[in-house]
Amino acid sequence: MENDKKHNQKQNNVDENEFPNSKVLLVSVKRTRRFLERTARELLAGGTRYIILSGLGDALPLCVQLQSSLQSKNAANVVKIETSYSYFNSNYSYTPGLKIYMEKHPEFKGSRISPGYVSFHEKTDSFTPIYDENPNEYICSLNAGDNNLYVGGEGINGAFSELLSSHNQEVDKYESLFKELLTKAVNENGEKPDEEVKSVLYDNVDKKYPDVKLALCRIRNSLKKGSDHSTGSVFIVTFKKNFPHKKEKNMGMVYVVGPKGKNYNSVEEFLDEVQETAENLMTTLCDYNGLVKREEIKHVRMNTCRICLFSGSIFKHPNASKLDVAKAILNGLAVGYRHGPSPRLNFAYDENVFKDAWVETTGLQVFNHNEQ
């Protein structure tokens, strides 16, 4: 047994020297090929250069099938194959083994976000609805907010105000709620690097804000302007009552304060901050679902988040296109993506830029929302 450990450690060192920036994917018949292929693609999309497919015994056929699938889809190419025949004391027998070394294909794009988690609205005679009249799953919808943290005004922020007010919500109170939450988030996280920032909750929120069941906020310190931490901040509120279209599955609002193009001299800086905001958005969504998994009796999981083009239209930089903004949003979401806690992402229609951005940045197929 000790000799086996030493041999494995020596082999790992050889692999690391010959194939830097590599990951070993253990292939087992307990996992489906679809799961293994998705994992391999996520690793490649995340920056891994080499995937080492490793299987023993009855997993060998699956290992070869996985290699064939990745190669046929221009995800990775085979650079080396090793076979082995090892004796295992545990079952007193020899077991065949296989290692297939694959390098990322030069044309591979991919995304850390599983394609099945992404859907796109098609063009209709009117805007994509903020909420569905008959939702079949728990959904939050994204509101492109303002640095002053109010719900109202023009664009989708005004549409949120009109819709929520029509269902007897006290919309004017959201501004004070968000400002209190932002202050708490800054007090607890304002001096931390972004990777150490935590989402903060408003304790007993329904006592002061009776429409709200849960409220949380996560800031992005790298985007603060002077003492103002609002840019890049993300708020999630779930409703306690007065649900849109009187449907409990229209569960809440995600309020995102994206950067405004007029505040940036460089279009590159603007798009970088859109991407950072989107990364913070995804992290906050995952934080929420992670929280409710621990407290599922009190709160429900967010199955889907409907996402509009924040920092787009009149708020984008004059030298940026809507497609540029959509790409920055998708790239940021991919950076923050965690497969377990992430909700599915449903993108609102806006000149088809989200679907175009997905195809251009990932090379992956799209799923039609209307066929879900």
Swiss-Prot record:
Domain of life: Eukaryota
Subcellular locations according to the entry: Nucleus; Chromosome, Telomere; Cytoplasm
InterPro entries: Alba-like_dom_sf
Any one GO MF annotation of this record: DNA binding
Gene Ontology cellular-component terms listed: chromosome, telomeric region; cytoplasm; nucleus
Assigned keywords, A-Z: Chromosome, Cytoplasm, DNA-binding, Nucleus, RNA-binding, Telomere
Entry's transmembrane regions: none
Functional description taken from the UniProt entry: Possesses DNA- and RNA-binding activities. Binds to DNA fragments longer than 14 base pairs with relaxed sequence specificity. Associates with the subtelomeric TARE6 repeats. Regulates the abundance of transcript sub-populations in a stage-specific manner. Regulates activation of male gametocytes. Participates in the coordination of sporozoite development in the oocyst.
Family to which this protein belongs: Belongs to the histone-like Alba family.
Oligomeric and partner information: Identified in a TARE6-associated complex consisting of over 30 proteins and including ALBA1, ALBA2 and ALBA4; the complex binds to the non-coding subtelomeric repeat region TARE6.
Name under which the protein is recorded: DNA/RNA-binding protein ALBA4
Organism (species): Plasmodium falciparum (isolate 3D7)
